[in-house]
Amino acid sequence: MTHELVGTVTSLHSDGGHNFSKPSITEAVFLAGIGIEGDAHSGPTTQHLSRQKKDASRPNLRQVHLVASELHEELRADGFDVPFGAFGENLTTSGLDLGELPVGSTLRLGDDVIIALTGFRDPCSQIDKFQEGLRAAVSFKPDTGPQLFRNGVMSVVVRGGTVRVGDTIKVALPAEPHQPMQKV
């Protein structure tokens, strides 16, 4: 018997500007191969300003940013002020350990939208400008490989549609062998 992984869309966020945090919204239109309609990070090629300077033609593997509400709760307990949307995430989830999912996992958001996970968010220096010590608080070093961060995972939109706060998230794992997430 296969255990079904199910979570919930706790909050949604979008901003047309390249700001660190994003304001809350009640629903969002996801566009296949693009991201969230009206969000500064949506587009078929990289939209993050630091990455555009290096190579603006690269595919955008960071169309939609997800953070678990459980991380927000943990950081608040440690004294950080991190409301939903504070990390610049588009989607705050509950009930899923996003960092444990392999690359290529697909998440069905509500009835229509499907996104595919591409990797961990690699935070820029703005995270410590937002709150001192936050970068260290979300860092971890696996037994092998580079230092990683648990301040969210990135994804691309496979199938578009509208997502609303409270929608169910259903996870489908890719075929084995599973590839662990790396930073993108």
Model-predicted regions and their roles:
Residues M1-V184:
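Metal-cofactor-dependent catalytic cores
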